[in-house]
A protein has these predicted regions:
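Transmembrane beta-strand segments of outer-membrane beta-barrel domains in Gram-negative
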Residues: 17, 82-177
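Outer-membrane beta-barrel initiation region
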Residues: 1-84, 125
Length: 177
């Protein structure tokens, strides 16, 4: 009397996920089509860590569009937090862009590198309330080259910078019922 018997059944799920995407988010100069391949494993070492890798390009303009990213997250239950690392790279070339042929001709290119390291401390982490303190450090390296020809007169410009970022962030989320 007053007793319950509960049977729980769990199915093993595949931790590997692949996705191939095709979209029309490009331009006429770098190809209208973008293709992406993404891989995510949400339990790579058997300890609920996550690895994600993604690459994007333009099939007809592979030499013009190359981007990629990798991310890894490691739960640290003994510390009540997690550590994450992200890296991304991008390279785009737009040659012979002629919005007004003979009057304005352009060649544009850019490269970017981003690296990030974050530690998140879970101050409160329940199904209803999440309070998280995030400490991060990042590095950015960007380079853009602009080549213009205005009525046959060449004008070249380069924008090149590197920056180190540091951040502290507090986030609070509360689920409403």
């Amino acid at each position: 009397a007053g007793a319950y018997r509960v049977l729980v059944h769990a199915d093993a799920q595949d931790n590997d996920h692949f996705r191939l995407g095709i979209s029309n988010t490009g331009t006429k100069y770098t190809g209208q089509v973008r293709s992406s391949l993404t891989y995510v494993n949400n339990n790579i070492s058997g300890m609920a860590d996550t690895l994600g890798v993604s690459v994007i390009t333009s099939p007809g303009h592979f030499s013009d569009v190359k981007t990629g990213a990798v991310a890894y997250r490691k739960l640290l239950p003994e510390m009540g937090g997690e550590l994450s690392v992200q890296a991304s790279y991008g390279k785009v070339n737009i040659d012979d862009m002629q919005p007004y042929p003979g009057l304005l001709d352009m060649d544009l290119s850019g490269k970017s590198l981003a690296l990030d390291l974050h530690y998140r401390q879970f101050l409160t982490y329940t199904s209803r309330t999440k309070n998280i303190l995030d400490f991060g450090i990042g590095y950015r390296k960007m380079r853009s080259d602009y080549g213009f020809s205005f009525s046959g007169t060449p004008i070249n410009y380069r924008n090149d910078y590197r920056v180190i970022l540091a951040s502290i962030d507090f986030s609070h989320r509360e689920r409403k019922e």
